[in-house]
């Protein structure tokens, strides 16, 4: 932005019928700022997640979702919530009103959800039945039953994907054993990077740490 363009801005959602909703106001852009925007279709996201869950089930692999909810605090918890809702679709379709009344927000994960419905045996059982019918999940802690979708910030893509790649595409399952894993990354910045990395290692083999050296992570923080 030039000096003349610098100043406050707002983010506005314009609906198909022309209705405008201000999502955020007073966003400050000093001169020299590079501004970029993007959007994601919730319908396309849900369709993609449903397809990936189905493919994972068919392939007999673990389902895993890799996001960065610690940094992308607005977008990634919402995307995570869509994954929770899609994975437990029969539960949300059947008990939507009861879950809403209990204060369940899928963006907070399955762990928070289970805590809020712990006194409702019927819904608790429905969740277990739905999970049994879905592909097994990549686990954060197999011993404690903490899944990839329990807490949005438990699986951070910068750490989880390198670990999975290093393990040959295998992750920990609910049975406390390693299994081939479907890594779902609904992010067109991250996904191509890891896809290219995986293809490279398929061609060249694993890195030899004695000759490849190290790369320091300095920690670039976005505003």
Question: What is the predicted function of each stretch?
Answer:
Residues 1-81, 90-223:
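Extended, well-ordered protein cores
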């Amino acid at each position: 932005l030039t000096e003349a363009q610098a100043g406050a801005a707002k983010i506005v959602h314009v609906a198909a019928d022309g209705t405008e909703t201000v999502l955020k106001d007073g966003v400050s852009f000093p001169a020299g700022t590079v501004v970029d925007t993007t959007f994601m279709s919730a319908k396309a996201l849900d369709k993609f997640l449903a397809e990936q869950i189905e493919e994972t089930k068919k392939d007999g692999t673990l389902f895993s979702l890799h996001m960065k909810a610690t940094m992308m605090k607005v977008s990634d918890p919402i995307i995570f919530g869509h994954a929770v809702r899609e994975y437990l679709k029969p539960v949300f379709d059947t008990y939507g009103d009861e879950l809403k009344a209990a204060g369940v927000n899928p963006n907070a994960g399955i762990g928070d959800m289970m805590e809020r419905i712990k006194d409702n045996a019927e819904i608790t059982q429905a969740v277990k039945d739905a999970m049994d019918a879905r592909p097994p999940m990549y686990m954060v802690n197999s011993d404690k039953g903490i899944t990839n979708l329990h807490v949005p910030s438990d699986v951070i893509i910068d750490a989880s994907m390198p670990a999975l790649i290093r393990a040959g595409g295998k992750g920990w399952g609910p049975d406390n054993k390693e299994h081939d894993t479907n890594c779902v990354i609904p992010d067109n910045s991250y996904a191509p990077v890891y896809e290219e990395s995986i293809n490279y290692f398929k061609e060249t083999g694993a890195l030899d740490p004695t000759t490849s050296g190290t790369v320091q992570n300095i920690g670039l923080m976005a505003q």
